[in-house]
Amino acid sequence: MDKVKLFQTIGRVEYWERVPRLHAYGVFALPFPMDPDVNWAQWFTGPHPRAFLVSIHKYGPKAGHVYPTNLTDEDALLNVIGMVLDGHDYENDPNVTVTLKAAVPIEYVQQDPQAPALQPHQAVLDAAEVLKLKVIKGHYFFDYTR
């Protein structure tokens, strides 16, 4: 899947949609098929709201499928396309909603299912520049539509 062509079809969206449990604001989201080899249950369980970055497979049989971004994998860092904001019915829906442009409080973003909930994940803060995340007033601002 060609990311540039995908984003050219999106166009501009002029409103921000509120994600209540996260106190976040997302401007545009699209459904993407989930990588079937990922244990999605560990990413969506637990009582606390959370968000995490996802990358997209560019080639091979899983092209177009998304997976949670591994912060130690350079290929995954280069192919980040957005963030999953809060829960998803992963057992009944093979497509996850990926937010491409948003403002999310940093305490909700954990890039490791074992990371403590509701605390800023230091690995994400350290990689913010590489991930194209701007940290402003306690929020990550990102725009992967560009």
UniProtKB/Swiss-Prot annotation:
Domain of life where this protein originates: Viruses
Location relative to the cell: Virion
GO CC annotation: viral capsid, decoration
Keyword vocabulary terms for this entry: Capsid decoration protein, Capsid protein, Virion
Function: Cooperatively binds the expanded capsid, thereby stabilizing the mature capsid shell and allowing the large viral DNA to be packaged. Trimers of capsid decoration proteins molecules are located at local and icosahedral threefold axes and stabilize the expanded capsid, which shows increased spacing between capsomers.
Subunit and interaction comment: Homotrimer. Interacts with the major capsid protein.
Protein name (Swiss-Prot/TrEMBL): Decoration protein
Organism, as annotated: Thermus virus P23-45 (Thermus thermophilus phage P23-45)
